[in-house]
Amino acid sequence: MKLAYWMYAGPAHIGTLRVASSFKNVHAIMHAPLGDDYFNVMRSMLERERDFTPVTASIVDRHVLARGSQEKVVDNITKKDKQEHPDLIVLTPTCTSSILQEDLQNFVNRASMSSDSDVILADVNHYRVNELQAADRTLEQVVRYYLEKAHRQEKLNLSLTDKPSANIIGIFTLGFHNQHDCRELKRLLQDLGIMINQIIPEGGFVENLHELPKAWFNLVPYREVGLMTALYLEKEFGMPYISTTPMGIVDIANCIRQIQKQVNIWSPILLGKKFDFEPYIDEQTRFISQAAWFSRSIDCQNLTGKKAVVFGDATHAASITKILACEMGIRVSCTGTYCKHDEEWFREQVQNFCDEILITDDHTEVGDMIARIEPSAIFGTQMERHIGKRLDIPCGVISSPVHIQNFPLGYRPFLGYEGTNQIADLVYNSFTLGMEDHLLEIFGGHDTKEVITKSLSTDTDLTWNSESQLELNKIPGFVRGKIKRNTEKFARQNNITKITVEVMYAAKEDLSA
């Protein structure tokens, strides 16, 4: 457990609730004190949905602490069973209520006896995993539960569909542009002549999970959620899975070639033919997607060699790093992720595309790294957007966690060929172009009386006299912050507290030496 005013990945119960509320006709009971029950408000605010969030808080109060939780939890489960008639009720504690060390599995067993719905306890260690790991585990638990139930009831149908088909695993509520990505993936698979068997958990019914093994393969677009489910299905039913994220021209082509390889295992036997997707890749890359053309244009060449910093979840940070370095010629000075549990995979993906790698879930480390590198643009989460505003560095948001402006009403996928256009726009518009800042200052676009200091520290031990301040204001805006910082660094090294014009020139000479 960690006390912080900003966390990249939330507590474990949020991940469980995100998965439960993504399914249709599934209700979640959260055994929690007041204060932990903010999920309903958060989801209602951020997701563009008309349905109520199917989550009920079973509040731990003084009466519960005095008498125990069993009666209240069981009553809440049976009440929701009668009111909502869900297919499944998921009970989850929070990290706070886990301190009580109650036998919640016993509560679930008791409630199951008087409920028509299936009732399960989310099998998650709330002290060891974060939101994303818990979501991955909960999805796998629900899929396993219903496939084992179907096996016991002899309802499991293992015969493949007549035409090539896929399950898309890992699209769920509050995901970064997940709804748009889902539409783009459906369009991509449709273009390839592949049917969608199931999409889980978003919009799926748990009663249909027994049909998952009918698909020819599973597609897992995000590493954070869905990989455990895909591994389980591979182990139990021999279902192949593809976990290459189709983001960026290169990885989309790789993903489609992997799909072709999987489809061609069965198509000669069941359909009497083989598929060739190379003409589709060629047409989309050259004529449909604008990104490949844009990367060769003079506009994109203006970005060559510019420095960028990337930070986000493992999937998006790795993909954006490769797009910037390989497809747009932008130098990635540092790339990082807050998914510490996926560090090995992340390092393997990005090691040849950036100068340094940062694995941390501490936003202050990220802020200090950005202040040190002084990139031309940042590509990160909502927190990097805040850091960018403080440092006067533009930021494009490419990963969760995000706020309301990154749940757009318009169509904004990051995956697929349309996603390449969106990413190219985002990257190009995030950089300050040419002499834009300087021209704005010349023509009075900005108030130039005060100098913007790019620093996250709150040190106030240095003072600038009026002459040095005037000299600093004469320097063009796009290099002024750097000169100010270098001068202050020189002053501290030489124990100078008052900065004059002479100190500025001495700092310049020292730097040039």
Swiss-Prot record:
Pathway: Porphyrin-containing compound metabolism; chlorophyll biosynthesis (light-independent). GO terms for biological process: light-independent chlorophyll biosynthetic process; photosynthesis, dark reaction. Its main location: plastid. InterPro entries: ChlB/BchB/BchZ (IPR050152), LI-POR_suB-like_C (IPR013580), Nase/OxRdtase_comp1 (IPR000510), P-CP_red_C (IPR042298), Protochl_reductB (IPR005969), Protochlorophyllide_Rdtase (IPR016209). Its EC number is 1.3.7.7. Binds 1 [4Fe-4S] cluster per heterodimer. The cluster is bound at the heterodimer interface by residues from both subunits. It is an enzyme of class 1 (oxidoreductase). GO terms for cellular component: chloroplast. Its cofactor is [4Fe-4S] cluster. Component of the dark-operative protochlorophyllide reductase (DPOR) that uses Mg-ATP and reduced ferredoxin to reduce ring D of protochlorophyllide (Pchlide) to form chlorophyllide a (Chlide). This reaction is light-independent. The NB-protein (ChlN-ChlB) is the catalytic component of the complex. This is Light-independent protochlorophyllide reductase subunit B. It comes from Marchantia polymorpha.
